[in-house]
Amino acid sequence: MPWDVKFSHGLYLPQLGWWLDAHFPQKRSFVSHAHSDHTATHDEILCSAGTAALMRARLDAKRIEHVLPFGQTEQLTADCGVTLHPAGHIFGSAQCLLEHGEHGSLLYTGDFKLRRGRSAEPCATPHAELVIMETTFGRPHYVFPPTAQVLNDIATFCHETIADDGVPVLFGYSLGKSQELLCSLEESQLPVMLHPQTHKLTRVYEQFGIAFPPYREFDLATVRGHVVICPPQSRESAFVRRIPGHRTAMITGWAMDPGAIYRYQCDAAFPLSDHADYQDLLRFVEAVNPQRVLTLHGFATEFAQTLRERGLEAWAIGEDNQLELGIRSSPPQVRAGDATPSSRSSGDAGVAAPACATPLHAPDSFARFVAAADAVKATPKKLEKIAVLRDYLAALTPPDMGTAATFLTGRAFPQRDPRNLTLGWSVIKRAVLEVAGVTEADYRDAYHRFADTGDAAGAVLAQRSLRPGDATPSSRPEILGVAGVADPGPAASRPAATSAPTTCSLADMALFFERAAAARGPAAKLDLLRERLALITPDEARYLIKIITGDLRIGLKEGLVEEALAAAAGQPLEAVREAAMLCGDIAAVARAARTDTLAEIQLTVFNPLQFMLASPEPTAEAIVDRFAAQRTAEAAAIVAGVGDPGPGSSSPATADAAPALARIWLEEKYDGIRCQLHKSGGRVELYSRDLNVITEQFPDLARAALALPHDFIGDGELLAWRDGRALPFAELQKRLGRKGGDDFFLGAEIPVSISFYDLLWLDGRSLLKEPLRERRALLERLLHGDATPSSRPDGDEGVAAPALQPATLNPQLSTKFSLAPVTFAHTASDIEAAFLAARQRGNEGLMAKDPASGYTPGRRGLAWLKLKKAYATLDVVVVGVEYGHGKRRDVLSDYTFAIRDEEHDNQLLTVGKAYSGLTDVEIAQLTQHFLEHTLEVHGRYRVVVPDTVIEVAFDTIQPSSRHQSGFALRFPRIARIRTDKTPAEIDTLATCRKLAAAAGSGGIAAVGARPPPAASD
């Protein structure tokens, strides 16, 4: 007969009548170690001598103690022997090996580590048939650096802080981690002071003969020159605040997580843990050589899955054990008391929830989507990602292929679809808490680990030991057999033998998103989300919420989805990419690719396409070098017979001609809103950068466009405009909030204009592949009332001549539409002069363009470059806020902001803090938003959902260890709120590196320096 294991706030062995690390007071319990989350005031305990002594120091209560030396076997019951083995976690930590004649051997590890610590007994690996093991760091991400390296880094941090006349403060648990640090700092010869609680427990260690290097109890008067070791919970206390010049460091395995420094609000974080990392978990299983494994704590589901993939029977205790893509094992049975999906109540006005009865392994199941997404995340290799998606997508029907492709881009709907879920963070959190039955503190802890709403929700939902309809966890523990599979309960409640696990389909999830978008008000949306979360597994919930928040964070760009679609459908990649650029609907592209109708996708009016983007360059010299290198490469390719300049190409016939083509087309970069204007017959629509319709906010522009005689799609900058020049962006923002009516005085109060610089479509003809010089010529004629085709305008070396720039426009349109002025440059000095002139006119900088380039929607290539050197700016996302001072003491006006690291899953890295630049009205609006989207509170500081993009100006950028990005901005100030941008569009770590390199070489030395005054007229 196998072991019976019940799980509810600890593990219970009914065949023995003993608990293992019970969380609440019980009659009898084994206590693996003395950390507070493993102890309680039990009547009778089994533990090691070290644990017993530490418990007496921490937990003053009467109890019966069975203290067992390591390696000594005694009878726990008449027919079961017990042996304690060192776990290596902290001093006295023990594993419990049970040996029963009928049930076999069971090893419970408690918390453990294989790494040999300096203040704990080394971990043993006794053989057992069944192992119940902790898997705190059960993901491949958690492979710790060599201990010697980490300790050296900690010592360096301490030495540097003391050298700067500061006091290094190291945060580690007062029991275990602090003693490890104390021993580890001996070689660095650093004097150490201990927090009073840490000091008390260290004295207990010494009673067992453990020797430490010299240390003192904390003394504020003599603290300078010392390292202070104290528990993590003191980091926000007056104890730390009163230490002069303190610099703090968190010592934890979670330092491996992105943003750990920010999450812990410390100056540094070092990955030293008393738990086994991923590799040691695998080594432990190999050494113990069990027949089956039950996992718990941390990433239990993921590690159990890893073991199954290696051929070992393994299941996560208290969590859903859904099978991943390609796993052939039998799934766990349904638990007793579980409601079937179709019987669960709906939160939507009493209407029954969708049945979600798709077989688990059906190609269109959402579980298969989740497995494919996890497989993509698991590999850093582009070709492997594409192969995973190719195989997944190839098995789907055209409609399902379209739905999956949309979800893979992190969206519920195609980009051009105007529907919005408006499922905010507070609704998501509330739904997760209600379904999981956990506290808000549990949710915060999960968010700390992942810094991702979806991953945090998945982890919290995985903690629920019972599904809705079961008895409460406290009244009916989950019963597990030796395989870790839940006992199905009485035969009457078991599903028929022919039944198979079911899940939601892709179509089910798409219908959910449609219902959520159509639902009115947060209450209705909450009901829908709660209903859906109750129907699906934690892993499925993880990706559901990732899609809701708009970012899968699996290392997948839309370009890779396009490559996978092409491979799955057997279509040319360029055809798929062109179709995606034209229609902005990846679902439509997927369906067309599968049905061989890609050629039918054409650029059409009122279907906005993504804007062509420019790559940033920090200096004029960099722009010249970039274009020169590009032209030389093109020329060399043609001479070698491997290149084709194509229609309108500026590539020379020989490589010798390349230097003559260094003439560069320049346009001024305005501080406005990127805008597409679509006009056909009597209809006009305006679209913003994020492809939203903004016609209602600018009806005067729409009316003016009706005067144009041709149908067209134009690309330009929408500006607040008066007396022939652009007004500050703040003036334009006053128009952005007004819609739903045609204010007669609006145009006079805040006049607006569009400065056009490109023409994409004219009278049914796509111009995307035409060279820029041709598109510009047609744009000029359009605004003059004549858009008939003409021969290519003459220009020096084939470059469009300045004559393309008209002196006057159609009088009816001159106040509403203009052509972006074009100038030309040969050298970096020319570009510098043009830049200063643009700055003098109050504009942001320059755009440098290749006049032979086509228009590539949504692509950030090298045909367009932007220079914003002086008064440089970065688009960043707010991750933390604080209350201000003085008149702003009651509003959140101080903002900590971050850029993204595109090379590491777009994790957010802080780069600075700013508190000036916004109006009182804007600050008041943002205060309300941030109060509603606060993740956690640390005194005056609030961690907020990273959903607000701002543009930050600064004087220069330089390397710095102060922020997670490794860079700091000099005199940052907020230029504007970027409501037109999402966090996925903020600037990157690579951009910071380029700007810092330019600053170091003098390229941004002029940043913050005013351009010279203009010559008087």
From Swiss-Prot:
Active-site residues from the entry: 669
SUPFAM superfamilies in the cross-refs: ATP-dependent DNA ligase DNA-binding domain (SSF117018), DNA ligase/mRNA capping enzyme, catalytic domain (SSF56091), Metallo-hydrolase/oxidoreductase (SSF56281), Nucleic acid-binding proteins (SSF50249)
Any one of the GO BP annotations: DNA biosynthetic process
Cofactor: Mg(2+)
Function: DNA ligase that seals nicks in double-stranded DNA during DNA replication, DNA recombination and DNA repair.
Lineage: Bacteria, Pseudomonadati, Verrucomicrobiota, Opitutia, Opitutales
UniProt superkingdom: Bacteria
UniProt-annotated binding residues for ATP: 667, 674, 689, 717, 860, 866
Reactions catalysed according to its record: ATP + (deoxyribonucleotide)n-3'-hydroxyl + 5'-phospho-(deoxyribonucleotide)m = (deoxyribonucleotide)n+m + AMP + diphosphate
Enzyme class, first EC level, given as a word: ligase
Stretches the record annotates as DNA ligase: 364-1017
The keyword Nucleotide-binding is annotated on this UniProt entry: yes
GO molecular function, one term: DNA ligase (ATP) activity
InterPro entries associated with the record: ATP-dep_DNA_ligase, DNA_ligase_ATP-dep, DNA_ligase_ATP-dep_C, DNA_ligase_ATP-dep_cent, DNA_ligase_ATP-dep_CS, DNA_ligase_ATP-dep_N, DNA_ligase_N_sf, NA-bd_OB-fold
Region (Disordered) location: 326-352
Protein name: Probable DNA ligase
UniProtKB keywords: ATP-binding, Cell cycle, Cell division, DNA damage, DNA recombination, DNA repair, DNA replication, Ligase, Magnesium, Metal-binding, Nucleotide-binding
Region (Unknown) residue spans: 1-363
EC number per UniProt: 6.5.1.1
Signal peptide: none
Keyword field contains Cell division: yes
Family of this protein: In the C-terminal section; belongs to the ATP-dependent DNA ligase family.
A Pfam family the protein falls into: DNA_ligase_A_M
PANTHER family: DNA LIGASE 1/3 FAMILY MEMBER, DNA LIGASE-RELATED
